[in-house]
Amino acid sequence: MRRLIPVLVAGLLASCAGPRSLEVKQFVLRDTGADYGEDAMVRSEKLRRLHGAIGVKEQAERLGQYYTVLWKDDSQGPVRVIFEYQQGGSGSLIKREVRDFDPTAISGQADFSVVGENFRNKGRVLAWRISLVRNGEEIASKRSYLWQ
């Protein structure tokens, strides 16, 4: 019993930890068919990404990779989320997308996507890095394994 108490205390303390300052969720939309044998969460995400695309051509334009960035920072000042990535067909070229947020915001969500012609011509994203910058200072960053 005495050995169990420290484990329970450690578990309670770990569950009280605040949310991470930067979280990245990735989704790859490979096809437009609604396969009901898939996991319900995957099928739901696929349908969400295809919502509003009526024709086959519109649906094909949405095939690609999606990145959802959730961030939280309690300080004040201009906020910028930067998405840098390299694609298979673009060699060592690093592409960059930026989302700016209100200086009073303490949390937010930024959505990035590599879809359509960009995805078809340049290929899939091989390496990426996402940075959270506030007041010109990098607060947090996440990167893929292949990012250098």
Q: What is the predicted role of each segment?
A:
Residues 40-73, 109-114:
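Contiguous beta-strand segments within globular domains
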Residues 59, 73-79, 121-123:
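A short beta-turn/strand-edge loop motif at beta-sheet boundaries
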Residues 1-16:
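Sec-dependent bacterial lipoprotein signal peptides
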Residues 83, 124-134:
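Short, aromatic- and glycine-rich surface loops/edge beta-strands on solvent-exposed regions
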Residues 100-108:
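Short proline/glycine- and polar residue-rich coil/turn motifs
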